[in-house]
Amino acid sequence: VKTSVKTSVKDSITMTIQLNETHNPELRSWVASANQPDSDFPIQNLPFGVFRRHGSHQAFRIGVAIGDQILDLAAAHAIHAFAGYTELQGGHFTTAINAPYLNALMALGTPVWSALRLALSRVLRADAKHLAALQNCLLPQSAAEYALPAQIGDYTDFYTSLHHATAVGKLFRPDNPLLPNYKWVPIGYHGRASSIGVSGQQFRRPVAQTKPPTAETPVFGPAKRMDYELEIGIFIGQGNAPGDVISMDQAEAHVFGLCLLNDWSARDVQAWEYQPLGPFLAKNFATTISPWVVTLEALAPYRQAWQRNAADPQPLPYLDAPDLRDSGAFDIQLEVLLQTEKMRADGAAPQRLSTSNFRDSYWTVAQLVTHHTVNGCNLNPGDLLGSGTQSGPAPEEAGSLLELTEGGKKSIALSNGEQRLFLEDGDTVILRGWTQKQGLPRIGFGEVTGTLLPARS
């Protein structure tokens, strides 16, 4: 993966990431669990999150996942674990590393993120010095509770899966499933940031207007067609000033990292309200994200060339770039599992419903960032972009129940004898994501879980 770094008069940094010593697949950590081949968090990953000891009621702290542990960054900084790195000195870094959210660290930009990753890699390696002091900076993940990684000021959800858009379009417009703008412009809408929660979120079945097919007028009550959406979340790092455009060659330098995202949806509410402005109450009640943010630098060895079908319109010039063609896609395997209330009561494991891969996305991370700002819209550190439901080309790769059940016509038989068309009260949905390549370690995102509770009476 190529790297170019330059600074303009507006202090924007253009950067794609070079492989470096932190990507060495031979690296091992003194945290033994990080060396297990099935670990989501080997030393080559080092994702960021916000945590505290479960039940402590203390302030949240910034941490990095390593194996089944969390390294407390403020504690590590206090014992001078990051001494000797110019980018990691001074008041701005100290303030950022001691904050209860990642926003200030996100705002410091790629030179600081990369230097911090290098410093972390070196102090966590098997041959690192001062192990006794660093061991006191660890907390088992099993003893932690999490908050949102950042204070999310704005949330925009996109619609980047051609396969999802086509499948859903066929349900409502069989003769014209894909609207004419889809292959030209990344479709997005502004979502609700206040109801985004971290993994483990529980929320009540929303109540709203719907219009059943046989009814002459709408009715008010609990939504009946509850669904999940399998998505990738994109956290913005450094923002841009109002009026400035983030070009394609700058876009990924403004991305702090990726997470998993479940965009819960009430399909019957959505069907009634979405015209002409799109979903509102159908989606604003809850969105759940994973606690760990995986940096683009960690994902660098797992990039792929991005291709657009020759028969399709090619991106307009502002959405195209040589680096996009060379390595614009991310090979991230995604998975959805369901655990019903009965499964939990019986001690049964969750059942996998589908898998897909982010590499099949029609639009890339860089294109979303550039398109979002091309009219001068400013992004801020901690802003969140959703990829939209990630479905693959095969029916079993659908990222929502709406697709898997063909709009509620085809029931899913679960292994314990239960059936599902849409989610029922007590259902827990689990999303997982990881990337893996021959000769390289597994880089995981952990998981994001959420549980649907009954509507308020």
Please report, for each region that a protein language model flagged, where it lies by residue.
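Residue-level marker of beta-strand positions
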Residues: I62, Q69-I70, E231, L384, ...
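Active-site microenvironments in enzyme catalytic cores
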Residues: E21-R53, A65, D72-T355, Y362-A366
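Compositionally biased, intrinsically disordered low-complexity segments enriched
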Residues: V1-I13
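Conserved phosphate/anionic-ligand binding catalytic regions in large, soluble enzymes, centered on
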Residues: D154-S161, N378, D383-S387
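Active-site pocket scaffolds in enzymes
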Residues: Y362-H371, P381, L385-W434, P441-T451
